[in-house]
Amino acid sequence: ADIVMTQTPASVSAAVGGTVTINCQASQNIDSWLAWYQQKPGQPPKVLIYRTSTLASGVPSRFKGSRSGTEFTLTISDLECADAATYYCQSYYSISSAFGGGTEVVVKG
């Protein structure tokens, strides 16, 4: 069966300096093969985290990825205005790939 990634919430807002948490639930085991992306309007997606918790080059440690079974979490702490974007999870287990529906993060200054 195809992997389905259920991402929640669809939208979240927090103040500068705050913390947001985004969840992705995989419909089946994907081990640690999960990446997180940030996309801003008019720009291609930027990989933030791969293999569940490994930060991509240049990504600050305010971004943290974690896993509990088939549930994956992206936590963004010490929010900055520049963090306002849409975030996506992606499973890339075996030859299968599936994206979550996205979470819009609104940062209130």
Swiss-Prot record:
Keyword Nucleus: no
Region annotation Framework-1: where it falls in the sequence: 1-24
Region (Complementarity-determining-2): 51-57
GO CC annotation, single: immunoglobulin complex
Region entry Framework-2, spans: 36-50
Record-given protein name: Ig kappa chain V region 3374
Region annotation Framework-3: where it falls in the sequence: 58-89
Organism in which the protein naturally occurs: Oryctolagus cuniculus (Rabbit)
Keyword flag ATP-binding: no
Taxonomic superkingdom: Eukaryota
UniProt keyword list: Adaptive immunity, Immunity, Immunoglobulin
Further remark: This chain was obtained from antibody to type III pneumococci and was isolated from the serum of a single rabbit.
Region described as Complementarity-determining-1: 25-35
Spans annotated as Complementarity-determining-3: 90-98
InterPro entries: Ig-like_dom, Ig-like_dom_sf, Ig-like_fold, Ig_sub, Ig_V-set, IgV_Light_Chain
Region Framework-4, residue ranges: 99-108
Transmembrane segments: none
A single BP term in Gene Ontology: adaptive immune response
